[in-house]
Amino acid sequence: MAGVAFGSFDDSFSLASLRAYLAEFISTLLFVFAGVGSAIAYAKLTSDAALDTPGLVAIAVCHGFALFVAVAIGANISGGHVNPAVTFGLAVGGQITVITGVFYWIAQLLGSTAACFLLKYVTGGLAVPTHSVAAGLGSIEGVVMEIIITFALVYTVYATAADPKKGSLGTIAPLAIGLIVGANILAAGPFSGGSMNPARSFGPAVAAGDFSGHWVYWVGPLIGGGLAGLIYGNVFMGSSEHVPLASADF
């Protein structure tokens, strides 16, 4: 069984840990700048028209590509979490200590906030869009949607990046993570906004000064990420036994 490790402050303030926090800050800043920037660009190009299908696809693709890059550039330094829900899920599965995870959260939230204020500045003060549950849906539906799509994201992180049995699959981890996020935004964007990432929702909320319904984007992703970590960490990584399929079985 995987266990949660509290860790020590000495380890969390080592040079390697400080580098990891900086890497998380930079990766999250770049991801949020591109992701939120794509939503701002869409609003400008369409004169604030309602989101349509081409716009949803463009924003989903932008988030997927940006996360692919953000994870890849941080992978060898911090693991490329770029998301408090990913960090939480990995902590639940014993892949990162709680203390280090808290500092990851701080770096991620600061990176997202910095990205959104930079966007507000370079766009001449254009509105920074925030996540919200679609009209006609309740907060509970939004939470459930975020639980499901964040579970899919963190499960993908475990399968392609955290699992020691991943083998050559690890080389495509950033791509797989980017793809699942893009796909989930296509599926959930019109309903919950498709956040999967408390930091992605936090920065825009701070920059816009609008925290209405913001709790949905903490509760849903943290439950989904925690469940993925609990299940994958204990069921699929809890045993060292692994029998790969023979090549003839593919």
Swiss-Prot record:
Distribution of this protein across tissues and organs: Strongly expressed in shoot, rosette, bolt and flowers. Also expressed in roots, flower buds and above ground.
Residue intervals passing through the bilayer: 21-41, 55-75, 99-119, 142-162, 169-189, 216-236
Induction conditions: By ammonium nitrate in roots. Expressed in roots with a circadian rhythm showing an increase after onset of light, a peak approximately at midday and a decline to lowest levels before offset of light.
Gene3D superfamilies referenced in this protein's UniProt entry, alphabetically: Glycerol uptake facilitator protein (1.20.1080.10)
This protein's UniProt keywords: Acetylation, Membrane, Repeat, Transmembrane, Transmembrane helix, Transport, Vacuole
GO cellular component: central vacuole; chloroplast envelope; Golgi apparatus; plant-type cell wall; plant-type vacuole; plant-type vacuole membrane; plasma membrane; plasmodesma
Vacuolar side: 42-54, 120-141, 190-215
Motif (NPA 1): 83-85
List of residues that carry N-acetylmethionine: 1
GO biological process: water transport
N-acetylalanine modifications at: 2
Sequence motif NPA 2, location on chain: 197-199
MF terms in GO: identical protein binding; methylammonium transmembrane transporter activity; water channel activity
Residue ranges, Cytoplasmic side: 1-20, 76-98, 163-168, 237-250
Assembly with partners or alone: Interacts with cucumber mosaic virus (CMV) Protein 1a.
Record's comment describing the protein's domains: Aquaporins contain two tandem repeats each containing three membrane-spanning domains and a pore-forming loop with the signature motif Asn-Pro-Ala (NPA).
Record protein name field: Aquaporin TIP2-1
